[in-house]
Amino acid sequence: MNYSELYKNEPVYIKDSTYDADWAVWKDGHTIYVRFEGTKSFKDACMDLLAFQSKIKAYDGATWDAHAGFKTAYYSVRNKVLDTCYNLYEEGDKFMVLGHSLGGAMALLATEDIGWHFKQKLTLITWGAPRVAKDQNGIDAIKEYMNEDSRNFENGSDIVPTLPWWFATNPMVVHIGEAKYSNAKALKDVLFNGCKKYHCGYGNQDLYSSIA
C-alpha cells in the first residue's frame, strides 16, 4: 500500500499491530518531520527488554551490533516510513527526525536510513533515548547523517539514557548527538511546548540547567 496516498494534506499516523510501533510523518513548509513514540504498552516493553545484540549492515558496508529489540521495532515500520517520506518529498526539502524513549532509539536507526536514501544530513532530536549501538561502527553510521543541530535531551534523574549499561564500550557509545541535561520542569515544558515555542526543543538554551 502507498500509505501517503491516504493523507495527501494530513499527517500520516500509523500504528504497527505486530510490535506496537507508532510513528507519524508530516510536512510543514520545506521540512518533513518523522516522529516515533516511546514505550506505552506491554509489546513496547518487550522490545525494550530484548537487549541482546543484532547485526546491522550499514550503507557504507560496515557491520555493527545494535539493540535487537529496537532494531525489530524499527524494521517493522521501516518500509512504510520510507515510502511515506518518498511520497512527501520534493526537491529542497529537509528532514527532522524526533523520538522519545523507545521512539528515540527508533529515530536513531531511522537517521541513517533516511539520510542515505535522500542523500542529506538531517536534524535528529531525541528525548530520554536509550543506547542503540554497541560499537563504533554503529556510532559512525548514524553520525554520518546527522547535522550540527542534532540534540539528545535528557532528564538528569532518568535512568533510561544509561541503558543498556553494557552497551557503553567506550565514551562515544554513551550518547549520539550533543547531550543537553534538564530538570523535570524544563523537560516537561519542552515536551509539551517545544515544537511550537522552541522549534522542537533545541532553540532556547536558557531552559536547560546542567546537572552533570
Positions of predicted regions on the chain:
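Extended, Lys/Arg-enriched charged tracts that mediate electrostatic binding to polyanionic substrates
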Residues: 1-17
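Serine hydrolase/lipase
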Residues: 3-4, 22, 30-31, 57-60, ...
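Short, surface-exposed "cap/lid" segments of acyl-processing enzymes
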Residues: 13-60
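Active-site loop->helix "elbow" adjoining a glycine-rich segment at hydrolase catalytic centers
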Residues: 101-106
